[in-house]
């Protein structure tokens, strides 16, 4: 979307052969006419796409036919949510009230304009009715993010403390970015977030903005409340997760009799949470929910203080200005504006006022045209620098980046079979190949050519992994 506002586009659908019928109007059925009563629907969207009119809006979302749906999403939600194929895109559809749908749509649009990580709002669908005339909930449509993963998918085999720590670090960074933009979330949780792989770490993206508010600037109380919600919700979600794994390990019938044979046992969050003390007393727990939830508070506060805190130093230590900027760059932020004041005692007061995330991503894009997340970009920039020093010393960085794209990037991607490219994004594949090359070189105590590293990576690593491009 960029920073340009979307112009809402409204459409009303009507049954074929009846002419243009407004969504607020009904077709009155004559007593002698056997045809059923059909009602219109109102669609407000910034993406005028005629395929939206073909979705079964007169059917409750929970009853949409399989030929429309891509997959049933896993996870816990207070709303009915389904994924539908619309043209060449996959959209997430969520039933809610008309007021909440319109409000969340507007919030997501404004967050996109502010540059914060969030799903793309596509449309609000209102004035839905069944063929019999019964009113149906409104629907909010958002675009599914390719390669995004719900947190439960990342724990599909077993709980892992390293993954848990990386997830809460990503959530802390997302919360800082949202708060800097003036967004009060009101429902911070792992469940309301999608995660994308980012060079061995994760990047977090807001999915549910239903309870959010945008202000010119958040108060300390608003930020603290969001952070406390994050701490509480993360602990609860991890406890539910651990209890679910314990339930899965038991022999016997599944807890939910409606489940098909061979599916993993489902569980209710409240029941799972209440079972946790027994689990923790009888088995070692690889993830400590309470320590992990405290980590998000620590990560958030450290990052917030580094990005916004005042630094005071003597006038003769002016080098500390450049040092502070470099620290922020290393964290992935550019300083767009700062206050640099002196007092009567000769001390300098430095306060960053406007910081912009994406320092390494922008730098990489400028010299290569490549799109990558922050940690992916950081890793690739390191390889470009090493590539330049080894083969083209003294060459300008933009030319080095162009040569790296031809001699490294293009050759790596050409060596990855097309049928395996849905398993990881290109930037993540590049990162993993570079890491694999280093691992092989360390193990064999010799430099391994990139071509050999790619071949080994494809067969020993990538081929066995699930496709994550459209994992729901």
Task: Pin down the residues of each PLM region.
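Residue-identity detector for glycine
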Residues: 2, 17-19, 262
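Juxta-kinase regulatory segment immediately upstream of eukaryotic protein kinase catalytic domains
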Residues: 28-69
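Conserved ATP-binding subdomain of kinase catalytic cores across diverse folds
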Residues: 52-153, 158-161, 165, 170-185, ...
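Short, low-complexity Ser/Thr-rich regulatory SLiMs
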Residues: 128, 195-197
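Hydrophobic residue at the +6 position relative to the catalytic HRD Asp in the kinase catalytic loop
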Residues: 188, 193-195
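C-lobe/activation-segment region of protein kinase-like
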Residues: 202-308, 312
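Phosphate/pyrophosphate-binding loops and the adjoining catalytic core of nucleotide-dependent enzymes
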Residues: 261-431, 469
């Amino acid at each position: 979307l960029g920073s340009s506002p979307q112009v809402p586009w409204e459409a009303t659908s009507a049954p074929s052969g009846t002419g243009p019928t407004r969504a607020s109007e009904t077709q009155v059925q004559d007593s002698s006419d056997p045809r059923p009563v059909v009602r219109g629907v109102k669609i407000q969207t910034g993406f005028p796409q005629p395929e939206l009119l073909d979705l079964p809006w007169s059917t409750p979302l929970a009853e949409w036919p399989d030929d429309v749906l891509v997959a049933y999403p896993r996870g816990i939600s207070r709303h009915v949510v389904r994924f539908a194929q619309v043209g060449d895109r996959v959209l997430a559809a969520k039933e809610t009230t008309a007021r909440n749908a319109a409000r969340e749509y507007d919030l997501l649009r404004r967050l996109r304009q502010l540059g914060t990580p969030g799903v793309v709002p596509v449309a609000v669908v209102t004035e839905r009715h069944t063929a019999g005339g019964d009113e149906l909930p409104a629907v909010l449509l958002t675009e599914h993010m390719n390669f995004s993963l719900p947190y439960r998918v990342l724990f599909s085999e077993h709980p892992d403390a390293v993954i848990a720590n990386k997830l809460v670090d990503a959530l802390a960074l997302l919360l800082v970015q949202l708060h800097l933009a003036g967004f009060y979330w009101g429902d911070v949780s792992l469940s309301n977030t999608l995660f994308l792989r980012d060079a061995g770490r994760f990047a977090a993206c807001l999915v549910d903005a239903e309870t959010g508010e945008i202000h010119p600037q958040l108060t300390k109380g608003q930020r603290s409340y969001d952070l406390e919600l994050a701490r509480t919700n993360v602990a609860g979600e991890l406890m539910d997760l651990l209890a679910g794994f314990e339930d899965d390990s038991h022999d016997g019938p599944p807890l939910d009799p409606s489940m098909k044979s061979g599916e993993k046992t489902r569980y209710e969050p409240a029941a799972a949470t209440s079972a946790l003390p027994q689990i923790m007393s009888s088995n070692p727990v690889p993830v400590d929910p309470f320590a992990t939830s405290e980590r998000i508070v620590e990560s958030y506060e450290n990052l917030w203080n580094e990005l916004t805190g005042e630094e005071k130093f003597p006038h003769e230590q002016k080098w500390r200005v450049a040092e502070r900027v470099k620290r922020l760059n290393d964290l992935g932020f550019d300083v767009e504006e700062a206050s640099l004041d002196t007092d009567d005692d000769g001390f300098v007061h430095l306060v960053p006022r406007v910081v912009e995330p994406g320092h390494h991503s922008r730098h990489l894009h400028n010299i290569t045209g490549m799109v990558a997340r922050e940690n992916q970009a950081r890793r690739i920039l390191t390889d470009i620098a090493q590539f330049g020093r080894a083969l083209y010393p003294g060459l300008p960085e933009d030319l080095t980046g162009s040569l790296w794209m031809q001699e490294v990037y293009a050759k790596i991607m050409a060596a990855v079979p097309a049928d395996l490219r849905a398993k990881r994004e290109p930037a993540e594949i590049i990162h993993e190949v570079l890491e694999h090359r280093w691992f092989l070189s360390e193990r064999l105590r010799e430099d391994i050519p990139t071509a050999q590293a790619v071949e080994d990576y494809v067969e020993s690593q990538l081929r066995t992994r699930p496709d994550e491009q459209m994992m729901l």
